[in-house]
Curated annotation (Swiss-Prot):
Family: Belongs to the IPP transferase family.
A molecular function GO annotation: ATP binding
Subunit: Monomer.
Naturally occurring in which organism (per UniProt): Cupriavidus taiwanensis (strain DSM 17343 / BCRC 17206 / CCUG 44338 / CIP 107171 / LMG 19424 / R1) (Ralstonia taiwanensis (strain LMG 19424))
EC number(s) on file: 2.5.1.75
Residues covered by region (Interaction with substrate tRNA): 44-47, 168-172, 255-260
Name of the protein: tRNA dimethylallyltransferase
Cofactor: Mg(2+)
Top-level lineage group: Bacteria
Keyword field contains Transmembrane helix: no
NCBIfam families in the record: miaA
Positions contributing to ATP binding: G19, P20, T21, A22, S23, G24, K25, T26
Key word tRNA processing present: yes
Length: 322
């Protein structure tokens, strides 16, 4: 194992390994753990949940033993975890890991968390439980595509980048418009114009992005992985969550890709084949959103995740001195 890279004391290194779902982030991260004393900080809004292992592709017990991992299995599925909580946790962990003489390795694909950490949190209105309940009721009566059409009337920019069934994001955009009287896209644009960022531009961040040279090949990989999850007992996992009695499809945990589709299957809203198709399609949509976020990250160094030597390329870019 090599020593920690020699960066300026003012800029101790933080390596970020970003990529869409099924891009091979775990394998690359574990390879980096063989090169330097890293501690892995999960950048994944689904891995925070306990009792959700198969559908989140959570690292195995053996993989978790290779290096210290953080922000995995930290909250109950009945609870929520925000970008603000992630930033607070990640900043604390980065300091603690550096104090131990180790390298923080941030690994994942929840780009909202990455942007919040490196660019700061936005000042959008806080969630309003009563308004969300009202929107949920409206969606139950008319369907999320109808609410997507409503959003298109007041915030066409945001609506254009959201799928008609992207319930969580449609709800948030409508909520922001109702509370502020302004489109979310306009608020975000103004904040971006007035903000000066120190985060990702800081020399301490080494940002490596795993991106596919062939989107179709990654789509095939996503389908194979979803089928493997089903074979491993994904449906049984969701059945156990349902049996608790305190969870429902409106929770962020159950809105995670794959879980919502299996929940609908268990509710009798879809047959097995339809559930499988919807789960794969939702995962591909997630992948598309992740890649869109990544490509708006100019500080990244890109590695083709389909290349046979992609792990070696990641190791070279991480620059641990080997």
């Amino acid at each position: 194992m090599s020593a920690v890279p020699h960066d300026s004391p003012a800029h101790p290194p933080v390596v970020c390994l970003l990529g869409p779902t099924a891009s091979g982030k775990t394998a690359a991260a574990l390879a980096l753990a063989a090169d330097a004393p890293v501690e892995i900080i999960s950048l994944d809004s689904a891995l925070v949940y306990r009792e959700m292992d198969i559908g989140t592709a959570k690292p195995t017990r053996e993989e978790l033993a290779v290096a210290p991992h953080h922000l995995i299995d930290i909250i109950d599925p009945a609870d929520s975890y925000s970008a603000a909580q992630f930033v607070a946790d990640a900043e604390r962990l980065i300091g603690e890991i550096h104090a131990r003489g180790h390298v923080p390795l941030i690994v994942g694909g929840t780009m909202l968390y990455y942007k919040a950490l490196t660019q700061g949190l936005n000042d959008l209105p806080q969630a309003d439980a009563a308004l969300r309940a009202e929107l949920d009721q409206l969606a139950a009566e008319r369907g999320w595509p109808a609410l997507h059409a409503m959003l298109a009337e007041v915030d066409p920019v945001t609506a254009a980048r959201l799928a008609p069934n992207d319930a969580q994001r449609i709800q948030r955009a409508l909520e922001i418009h109702r509370l502020s009287g302004q489109p979310m896209s306009a608020l975000l644009a103004r904040q971006a114009e007035g903000r000066t960022f120190a985060g990702a531009a800081d020399q301490r961040y080494r940002v490596i992005a795993l991106e596919p040279s062939d989107r179709l090949a990654l789509h095939h990989r996503i389908a194979r992985r979803y089928d493997a999850m089903l074979a491993q007992g994904f449906i049984d996992e969701v059945e156990r969550l349902r049996a608790r009695g305190d969870l429902h499809p409106g929770l962020p945990s159950i809105r995670c890709v794959g879980y919502r589709q299996v929940w609908e299957y268990l509710d009798g809203e879809a047959d097995f084949a339809t559930m499988r198709e919807r789960g794969i399609a939702a995962t591909r949509q997630l992948c598309k959103r992740q890649l869109t976020w990544l490509r708006s990250t100019p500080e990244r160094r890109v590695v083709d995740c389909l290349a046979t030597d992609y792990v070696d390329q990641v190791r070279r870019l991480a620059d641990f001195g080997h």
